[in-house]
Structures are given as structure tokens and as C-alpha cells.
Amino acid sequence: YTPILGQLNRLKVNHLTMEFTTPAAGDMAVFKHLREDLEIGLGCVSCDPGQVDSVDEIVARVETALRYLTPARITLNPDCGFAPGSAAKVSLDEVATKLKNEVEASRRLREKYS
């Protein structure tokens, strides 16, 4: 995201969704350089077939973001999406497991940080 930080900060929006389950996304330290009024939809669950992030992995990913953002600025979401018809075929059972893990991670994080 570093090459487009200037453009992101100029957007007339209150919320950005950013993917962070892939190393290509870069370091979450990028959050230090975003406007403080921006909420971040943190991509914390992989949409790749066969990769089911554990609850602990999701919590750890969010806690990394919390080094740079307050809890109130973060919403959790999967990276990208589970688009039907896309090249990445993810079974509905796998999608359900991924989302259940995200919900449990959210519950744990709320308990700890609310």
C-alpha cells in the first residue's frame, strides 16, 4: 500500500478495506501513515482455497494491526471475498469454517479490548 498512501489519504471516504493475509500487502506499519479519521476494514481471513486461518492466527493478525490503530478504528473482514464464479473455488463448508473462525476471533478480541 505504500506507493498509494497519498491517494488513499485524499479519498473522501471514512472507511478503507485493506487485505492483509498475503505478504504482498506489505507491513501493517503503513497504518501509521493513514489519516486518523479512517476506519480500516482489516482483511484478516484468507479467501484462498484450502487455507483456513485458525482463530489464534486471526487474533494475532488483528493484534498486529492494534499496534498502529485503536480498536474502534478496526472492523474485521475476509480478504477480497468468496466470489462465486471466480477462479478460486472455495467450498461453502470451507467458507463457513473461515467465517466461524472470524466470528470467534472477533468475540475474543472484543472481550479483551472492549
Task: Indicate where each model-derived feature is located.
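Domain-level signal for soluble alpha/beta catalytic cores
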Residues: 1-114
